[in-house]
A protein has these predicted regions:
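Metallocofactor- and cofactor-centric catalytic cores in central/energy metabolism, strongly enriched
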Residues: 37-68, 74, 78-83
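Short, charge-rich amphipathic segments
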Residues: 10-17, 34, 75, 79-82
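Short, Lys/Arg-enriched N-terminal segments with co-localized hydrophobic residues
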Residues: 1-9
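N-terminal first-folded block
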Residues: 14-49
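A short, ordered amphipathic alpha-helix with a cationic face
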Residues: 27-32, 67-70, 81-82, 93-94
Length: 120
């Protein structure tokens, strides 16, 4: 048995009259419950005003996660975005302009995905 356990504290957010469970950092617990209204709400909690460019990245992350069951590290995300959305968008500067507190971490939160681990 472990000497100590770190208990995850849950919270609830209400979006459009429906409750959604989040972890202590505001990441959605059940990614299947995500929708654009939830994404918009989570973006507001991160002080991100969603534009078409933000949604491109968020939808890309959701597709990537559905295919690989993991969120990409920033380097992988940058390369993949460049291939799919164009070289001008495949730069870390572009992604940091959209998500100033970290493209992987912040965009994953808005996309309803688990917090990325490792090198983000």
């Amino acid at each position: 048995t472990p000497l100590f356990t770190k208990e995850k504290h849950m919270a609830t957010i209400e979006v459009s009259g429906k409750n959604y469970e989040t972890d202590e950092e505001g990441y959605l617990v059940n990614l299947a419950e995500w929708n654009e209204d939830v994404g918009t709400y989570l973006a507001q909690t991160e002080s991100v005003e969603m534009t078409e460019q933000h949604w491109e990245v968020v939808n890309f992350l959701r597709d990537y996660y559905n295919e690989f069951q993991i969120a990409p590290a920033v380097r992988v995300l940058t390369k993949a975005i460049g291939k799919k959305l164009g070289a001008d968008k495949g730069t870390s500067q572009y992604l940091y302009d959209l998500f100033p507190y970290g493209p992987a971490k912040q965009a994953c939160k808005i996309a309803g995905l688990p917090k990325p681990t490792g090198c983000v």
